[in-house]
């Protein structure tokens, strides 16, 4: 028997058959899916994802020299064959068969790139795609002999149907919980099913890439034992907080400073106590200066201790500057930089374009992930494969979303839908953290966020906010708005009165104009500095230090 090849190593010394690759992806999909109680669904995706390579034309392509491969890249399609096989075999039974076959066949067809099943003109792209499959009889014959016969597919399929039924019941209960009108139910059901489709695709893409990287570059993915890591991180966190306390007590403090320090510790204690609650969607409303980052981290670590199945802790913020400010705090607090991934557009890494770094940097395998709201939303909604593959990492995790009020209004509905899905179907524990909570549960929304009870992690919010009132806002009333040059001149006059002045503007151009004008009009002894995202991350950090 001649086994068809899936990959040949770059040094041309090692070969991986389609059967070997399928088995590797099957095992990875099973492990990832098992954590979500969908191991069989994920394994079916793995079994069929590459059977389209079981044909001579693809085997010849894999064995061809590099120039021939480059000329044929993208022209020998293989992913639709598995989709066609599943669709024709299983899209004939009851409604659950139809739904399951559609989920698996789309994941298989889209694992090298997503596509719309229906275009704007109403044509069904999916049907057209599988009708164009070539060499299907050869694929069926070879794959049944080399791959499919090795698996008890009927048993796996029956178990997959049971898994999908359980998922469907979770989604139905979520829709009923939202008390939607009849006109809303179908839309919500379709949205949540699409979320689940993306989840299955995420597991398949990530497993496919992982097994391929393991063979091609002999890269082993880093395995973190979350329970062990979080236990060590919790001990390190306690030592870190004790260090902060000792450092604080060394210096003579004012009554106000002592009071604020005491209140921060009280808030942190409330967060730790709240960790005994079950997985849900909660609000952490802490006044500015109340220590949101450390309080949120203390809660997450305590939750991981109370709920041993917790896999990751995510810290998400809207701005790179906030991430840069807080990621160092988190690294120091947990005591090991290797546990913490910082993922945003300004992160600078050596050999960033190397495949190994692409694999390790962006797969979100680390126990602690600090990323931006943009990257978070990309993971949930982008059509990019590297974004889709991360989605399943959010399952069984604590997700802290800081400054959630900064979310664009146009994102609210889809955000609410997806948070409800992550919590209910993916067992994610979500904390919306800010000093000014938006009304995401507004009852007039078509899809309000479904907060758990009790909703607020901190009690006596009104009292806490009064305790942190440290700023007095004095409006400078003018009939007309300042021009930038006028604003600079007003700041220049204020320099004689105040030792330090902070100016916050809403555009980089405005910052540049005011900065340049101030340098022209103030005395040389006055130090003028500016910070914008036009500066690279390292430059900003040096300025702040």
Residue ranges, per PLM feature:
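Accessory nucleic-acid engagement/destabilization modules that flank
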Residues: 2-12, 18-239
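Conserved Walker A/P-loop ATP-binding site and its immediately adjacent core
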Residues: 310-334, 347, 439, 508
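Conserved strand-helix element at the start of the C-terminal RecA-like helicase core
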Residues: 312-323, 494-519
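Inter-Walker segment of RecA-like/P-loop motor cores
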Residues: 336-381
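Interdomain hinge/linker at the junction between the two RecA-like core domains of SF2 helicases
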Residues: 436-494
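Conserved helicase motor
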Residues: 7-10, 341-353, 506-509, 528-542
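SF2 helicase catalytic motif II
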Residues: 376, 387-425, 430
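Walker A/P-loop
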Residues: 278-300
């Amino acid at each position: 028997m001649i086994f068809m090849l899936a990959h040949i190593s770059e040094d041309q010394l090692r070969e991986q058959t389609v059967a070997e690759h399928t088995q590797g992806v099957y095992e990875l999909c099973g492990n990832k899916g098992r954590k979500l109680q969908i191991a069989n669904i994920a394994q079916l995706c793995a079994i069929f994802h590459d059977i389209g390579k079981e044909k001579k034309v693809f085997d010849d392509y894999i064995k061809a020299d590099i120039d021939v491969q480059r000329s044929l890249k993208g022209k020998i399609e293989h992913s639709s064959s598995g989709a066609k096989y599943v669709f024709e075999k299983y899209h004939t039974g009851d409604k659950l068969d139809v739904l399951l076959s559609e989920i698996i066949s789309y994941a298989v067809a889209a694992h090298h790139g997503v596509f719309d099943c229906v275009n704007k003109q109403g044509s069904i792209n999916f049907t057209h795609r599988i009708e164009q499959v070539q060499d299907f009889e050869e694929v069926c014959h070879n794959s049944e002999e080399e791959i499919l016969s090795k698996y008890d597919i009927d048993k796996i399929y029956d178990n997959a149907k049971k898994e999908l039924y359980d998922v469907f019941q979770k989604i139905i209960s979520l829709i009923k919980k939202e008390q939607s009108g009849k006109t809303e139910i179908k839309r919500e059901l379709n949205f949540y099913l699409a979320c689940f489709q993306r989840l299955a695709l995420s597991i398949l893409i990530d497993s496919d890439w992982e097994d391929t990287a393991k063979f091609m570059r002999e890269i082993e993915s880093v395995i973190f034992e979350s329970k062990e890591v979080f236990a060590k991180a919790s001990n390190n966190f306690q030592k870190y907080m004790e260090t902060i306390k000792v450092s604080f007590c060394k210096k003579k403090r004012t009554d106000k400073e002592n009071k604020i320090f005491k209140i921060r510790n009280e808030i942190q204690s409330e967060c730790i106590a709240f960790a005994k609650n079950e997985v849900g969607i909660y609000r952490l409303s802490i006044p500015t200066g109340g220590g949101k980052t450390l309080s949120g981290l203390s809660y997450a670590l305590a939750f991981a201790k109370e709920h041993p199945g917790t896999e990751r802790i995510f810290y998400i913020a809207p701005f790179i500057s906030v991430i840069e400010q807080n990621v160092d705090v988190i690294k120091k607090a947990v005591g090991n930089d290797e546990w913490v991934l910082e993922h945003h557009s300004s992160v600078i890494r050596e050999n960033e374009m190397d495949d190994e770094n692409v694999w390790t940097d962006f797969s979100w395998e680390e126990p602690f992930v600090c990323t931006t709201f943009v990257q978070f939303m990309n993971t949930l909604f982008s059509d990019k494969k590297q974004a889709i593959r991360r989605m399943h990492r959010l399952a069984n995790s604590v997700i802290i979303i800081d400054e959630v009020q900064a979310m664009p209004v146009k994102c609210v509905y889809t955000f609410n839908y997806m948070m409800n899905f992550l919590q209910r179907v993916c067992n994610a524990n979500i904390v919306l953290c800010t000093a000014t909570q938006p009304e995401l549960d507004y009852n007039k929304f078509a899809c309000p966020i479904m907060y758990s009870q009790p909703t607020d992690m901190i009690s006596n919010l009104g009292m806490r906010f009064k305790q942190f009132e440290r700023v007095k806002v004095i409006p400078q009333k003018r009939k007309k708005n300042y021009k930038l040059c006028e604003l600079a001149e007003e700041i220049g006059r204020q320099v004689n009165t105040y030792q330090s002045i902070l100016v916050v503007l809403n555009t980089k151009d405005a910052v540049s104009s005011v900065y340049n004008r101030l340098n022209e009009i103030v005395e040389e002894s006055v130090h003028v500095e500016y910070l914008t995202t036009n500066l690279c991350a390292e430059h900003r950090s040096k300025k702040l230090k």
